């Protein structure tokens, strides 16, 4: 089961996202600030973080999707430059969010492990 951390200052956004994601079969936790998110990331191995762009995502090496009420291109570009795998505007289109989550889940489970496989090293031929 994919574990999701929701980081948003709005209680209603946190509750709606948590309830919908749990309904869709995800395991979800929701917090309102960076300190709570960091503490939770130390205890739970999350697969993805959904974070409002106003919040700083914990530096835990976890892929994240940025959420924002600001629809400007500059905000989207800044989020992606800061490491977001996707950028969604509020109000959140749940179908788009679920598609993004499933794609990210696929990448994490299938493509990233390939990057960490040991690549055979080249050993030069030395007959002596």
Label each region the model flagged.
Residues 44-55:
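Active-site beta3 strand of CheY-like receiver
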Residues 11-29:
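Two-component/phosphorelay signaling modules centered on CheY-like receiver
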Residues 102-115:
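The C-terminal output helix
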Residues 92-101:
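C-terminal output helix
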Residues 25-34, 40:
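Short hydrophobic/Thr-rich beta-strand motif most characteristic of the beta2 strand and flanking loop
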Residues 116-128:
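AAA+ ATPase active-site-proximal loops
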């Amino acid at each position: 089961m994919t574990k999701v951390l929701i980081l948003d200052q709005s209680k209603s956004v946190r509750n709606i996202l948590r309830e919908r994601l749990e309904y869709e079969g995800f395991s979800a936790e929701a917090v309102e600030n960076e300190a709570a998110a960091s503490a939770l990331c130390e205890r739970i191995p999350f697969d993805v973080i959904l974070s409002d762009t106003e919040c700083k995502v914990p530096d835990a090496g976890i892929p994240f999707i940025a959420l924002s009420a600001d629809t400007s291109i500059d905000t989207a570009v800044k989020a992606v430059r800061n490491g977001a795998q996707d950028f969604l505007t509020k109000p959140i289109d749940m179908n788009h969010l679920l598609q993004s989550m499933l794609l990210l889940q696929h990448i994490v489970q299938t493509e990233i492990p390939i990057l960490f496989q040991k690549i055979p090293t080249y050993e030069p031929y030395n007959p002596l």
